[in-house]
Amino acid sequence: MLFEEIVIFGCGNPLFADDGFGPEVVEELKKYKLPDNVKVIDAGLGGPHFLFTLMAQSDEPVKKIILIDIADFGGEPGQLARLSVNDLPPGTYRDPHSWGLTEPLHMLKDRIDITIIGCQPKRVTEPDFEIGLSDEVQAAIPKTIQTILDILGVQHGTEGTAFKDLRNEREEGISTIPCSN
């Protein structure tokens, strides 16, 4: 099977400071024991466009996508927002190399449940290289992990494990997620 039932994509480039948020969340999430039907992918840069296109043409049963990336929604650095594809007008969501991601997301939204978790960046240094997240964005990673686990309907244990919970919650639209623990 090429994809699992639930796919989590971490998007971004760690060479441009806070743009590395998605890949950092993916690395942290890989420390957890997740349900067998969940696939976690560091989609990097530009890759999301191709992955979404491939998935749209695939017969494999992907039911849910969780997309983790930075998003400038006017919040405080490190603040999280949970968005649906309908919150993204066509042409508004682009990666740093100008791949339009809104259109592939809209193409998939009628057959795949898509949630976007965006983190307000403090700094994105493109074209200059700067490795490492700002303190505010780094501090948002634990809350992002908890939000992902909540979306998946799992609770995490004390040692980086996760176990299945039978909750089935779903929210629509933009909602900000407080970053305090």
Each predicted region: which residue ranges?
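A short glycine/serine-rich beta->alpha loop
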Residues: C11-L15, P90-G91, E130-I131
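Nucleotide and nucleotide-moiety/phosphate-recognizing core
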Residues: F3-I8, P14-D18, P23-V85
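Conserved active-site and cofactor/substrate-binding residues in soluble primary-metabolism enzymes
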Residues: G20, E24, L45, P96-W99, ...
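Helix-loop-strand module that forms the ligand-binding subsite of alpha/beta enzymes
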Residues: I70-I114
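Phosphate-binding/catalytic loops
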Residues: L101-N181
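Glycine-rich loops and low-complexity Gly/Arg-rich segments
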Residues: Y32-P35, K64-I68, P89-Y93, H106-L108, ...
